[in-house]
Amino acid sequence: MVATIMQTTTTVLTTVAAMSTTLASNYISSQASSSTSVTTVTTIATSIRSTPSNLLFSNVAAQPKSSSASTIGLSIGLPIGIFCFGLLILLCYFYLKRNSVSISNPPMSATIPREEEYCRRTNWFSRLFWQSKCEDQNSYSNRDIEKYNDTQWTSGDNMSSKIQYKISKPIIPQHILTPKKTVKNPYAWSGKNISLDPKVNEMEEEKVVDAFLYTKPPNIVHIESSMPSYNDLPSQKTVSSKKTALKTSEKWSYESPLSRWFLRGSTYFKDYGLSKTSLKTPTGAPQLKQMKMLSRISKGYFNESDIMPDERSPILEYNNTPLDANDSVNNLGNTTPDSQITSYRNNNIDLITARPHSVIYGTTAQQTLETNFNDHHDCNKSTEKHELIIPTPSKPLKKRKKRRQSKMYQHLQHLSRSKPLPLTPNSKYNGEASVQLGKTYTVIQDYEPRLTDEIRISLGEKVKILATHTDGWCLVEKCNTQKGSIHVSVDDKRYLNEDRGIVPGDCLQEYD
């Protein structure tokens, strides 16, 4: 294919050259005569016709195939060539970079200078760029050889990694000083003239250390850890039990914020006069509180009004009424005055006598609640009495226990006056008798349920009261149901149904 392309190109160039030569000669001859120009043109046409036509057309037909093949070859080969060329550039770059790092940090030798050894070990490519540098540094190599000869290292397997330095500066001897002593005479406390020469023998050093740390430490005094006995206190001292003051107060004079934690500057010693001169607590330190045992507190130490303030409500009435002669509370030996029983008045309750819980030392009696209802015709004058009955003990009590119980009873009476118990709320009905359990009532007003536990009742229906509440709501069961009464447990989910539920008590009236 390449030979055909070359042959076609040669043929075309030859034809063009022949045509240009012929045209030039014809142009010159046309100036002389016009007749000769016609003959020249005819000759040109004849020469062109005489050219083999099959060769020209075959070359022209083969030309598109050759151009398409070259285009495909360039489109494939050009990217591959560019990629290979770039890869070659990258490899050369990394190679030069690695050599530059090794040039800046060559391996160190003990006998040969650094630059000379590196110039010897580099390859021909590196020496090509760094030859001038090695030649310039060779002049300084002779000057450095003497230094390396002076510090000749042991080469081979016996080479050591230890480096020795020659220091001409004198060594300053070490010394230990106490805070209150000077540098010139650090061991004056021992009474011996000990030198600080570093050449002192080891035996003397051991003696100095032992004396300084254990035998005679400076500014430290032995303190006895014994505490004074109870007989040494000023309040318990007698003429025969006089003793001298503690040795601690004569020797110790150090003050610190932590002294009170070690019983050195605390107020404990000050209270009993054990430390009046030397034991001093800093003024800025907080004072410790005096400790007093509960068994030694006098009766008037606490103020009763401060411990138990009056918490009575100002809106309540307080009228002291005497007790009846036959009251069961008076059976306790008449230890409680009548004025300590408090009564309260309310619109619905004529008189409620509140008494404290029965408290007998070591036992708790059963508490009962008595409620008296009058006839429903006189419901406006009903009286409710709540009494807490305190039974007498079965066994006779000792005098001390009786006295203790009387004091406790008085204390409870005081509490009952200062902190009265709340009253039980009472339901109100508009002049009607209270609802009684187990009786049948008539519905006088329709009611539609609003909650899940309520039922619908209509005017004229008969219901039976099962339970009542202080707010006026009642649990009822319809009596005129066709299904009859269903006995279901209270814990069962079917206990509340369409015929058994909650209704307001105002919608009910007693059935005659």
Curated annotation (Swiss-Prot):
Record keywords: Glycoprotein, Membrane, Phosphoprotein, SH3 domain, Transmembrane, Transmembrane helix
Pfam family, one: SH3_1
UniProt organism field: Saccharomyces cerevisiae (strain ATCC 204508 / S288c)
Record's protein name: Nuclear fusion protein FUS1
Record SUPFAM superfamilies: SH3-domain
PTM comment: O-glycosylated.
Localisation per UniProt entry: Membrane
Membrane topology value: Single-pass membrane protein
